[in-house]
Amino acid sequence: MSGREGGKKKPLKAPKKQSKEMDEDEMAFKQKQKEDQKAMEQLKAKAAGKGPLTGGGIKKSGKK
């Protein structure tokens, strides 16, 4: 090994794996995840229109 041939012999990035065929369980799981994400975004949008949750009741000044 001479001085010019130092360093890593392996490439830094591993080659990408080929996309495998998904079976029925994986397809159903991915579909369920997409539906859950859509539902969460709808709930977030609905909740964003409302004001803060707290704010009712008697406010105390903190003075004694």
UniProtKB/Swiss-Prot annotation:
Residues 27-44 have a biased composition (Basic and acidic residues). It comes from the Eukaryota. Residues 1-64 are annotated as: Disordered. Keywords: Coiled coil. InterPro entries: TMA7 (IPR015157). Residues 21-50 form a coiled coil. Residues 52-64 have a biased composition (Gly residues). Pfam families: TMA7 (PF09072). The keyword Coiled coil applies. Belongs to the TMA7 family. This is Translation machinery-associated protein 7. The gene is tma7.
